[in-house]
Regions:
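Short alpha-helix capping/helix-loop boundary micro-motifs
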Residues: 235-240
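SH3-family beta-barrel domains
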Residues: 217-230, 243-247, 254-257, 276-281
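Short, solvent-exposed loop/turn elements at domain surfaces
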Residues: 62-66, 230-233, 261
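Segments that shape or occlude catalytic/ligand-binding pockets
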Residues: 106
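A generic structural motif
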Residues: 144, 234, 264-266
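Extracytoplasmic cell-surface/polysaccharide-interacting catalytic and binding patches
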Residues: 2-7, 11-101, 113-196, 202-219
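A short macromolecule-binding patch
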Residues: 266-277
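SH3/SH3-like beta-barrel fold
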Residues: 248, 261-265
Length: 281
């Protein structure tokens, strides 16, 4: 029996043989995390643990002075993350690393950004089309040393002056050289630069705007079921099961996707039905 609340009047059962049930009760098999598809959203730090992340829109340290989204982990499409792995490897050979200021920005965050600053000079109007950040394949980045110290660049993040574009003739030589190095490495690894912002790069592979995946600040939940819930590779009841979470066991919810929640459980990432989980109080 699984995926059913404790107070449900009808409990669905998952067919198992007696031998299988006995094996699962006594032996915990080794489980290998499946490799995500390129279009799947993943937590970037899982795949690039030494990358530096400073999500400006998760705080008030941005041009609006307000918090735009309430999660503090960087999320991107897995295909984009694979390219960032190559970027980070190249930079590490130079004693540098990437520092990321913004990644996936849900459409809800784009609407909030527009509400705060309804000026198309500064913010993409979501009523006319979403920012590429809402596709999960775009990053705002800079160069830094491993200790977090940022290199000199033409401007700071979200500077709206002419100095922010990719005409580096109007900034000092050191800043220009650093910006050109960042641009070259990103392009070599499969990103295209935006001419108006030296920090803005988009994966050359396009993805659709993502309307259902909604990251949250990681929150502790437990399995609210009679026996167990299934941890699946994708947000679908037809997806493969990679683990079973016993009733009462706890895990971290990282994001919501329609009727599913993306969770982290026992060093695995997968999806469970939201109807059968409850927050730990």
């Amino acid at each position: 029996m699984h995926d059913a609340p404790q107070n449900a009047t009808t409990i669905q059962t998952e067919p198992t043989t007696a031998h299988t049930a006995q094996t699962e009760a006594t032996v915990k098999p080794e489980v290998i995390q499946p490799v995500p598809a390129d279009e799947e959203f993943v937590k970037v730090s899982t795949y690039i643990p030494d990358i530096l992340v400073d999500l400006r829109y998760s705080t008030d340290h941005n041009f609006t002075g307000q918090t735009v989204y309430d999660f503090n982990e960087l999320w991107l499409r897995y295909g984009t993350v694979k390219k960032l792995i190559s970027v980070q490897k190249e930079l590490k050979g130079r004693g540098l690393c990437l520092k990321i200021w913004d990644g996936f920005r849900p459409p809800s965050a784009q609407f909030k950004l527009w509400d705060i600053c309804p000026d198309p000079i500064y913010v993409s109007n979501p009523n006319n089309g979403f920012s590429s950040h809402s596709r999960g394949n775009t990053v705002d980045v800079t160069l830094a040393y491993p200790d977090g110290t940022e290199l000199s660049m033409p401007t700071g993040f979200d500077d709206f002056s002419k100095l922010a574009d990719r005409d580096y003739s109007d900034c000092d030589q050191e800043a220009a050289a650093n910006a050109m190095l960042l641009e070259k490495v990103m392009q070599d690894c499969g990103f295209k630069p935006y001419s108006g912002e030296w920090w803005h790069f988009t994966d050359t592979r396009s993805y659709p705007v993502e309307h259902t995946f909604q990251p949250i600040t990681a929150t502790l939940y437990y399995a609210d079921c009679s026996e167990y819930i299934s941890l699946r590779t994708k947000p679908s009841t037809a997806a493969d099961v990679i683990a079973r979470i016993s009733a009462g066991e706890q895990f971290r919810v990282l994001a919501h996707s329609d009727q599913f929640a993306l969770i982290e459980y026992d060093n695995l990432f997968g999806y469970v039905l939201k109807d059968y989980i409850q927050p730990v109080e």
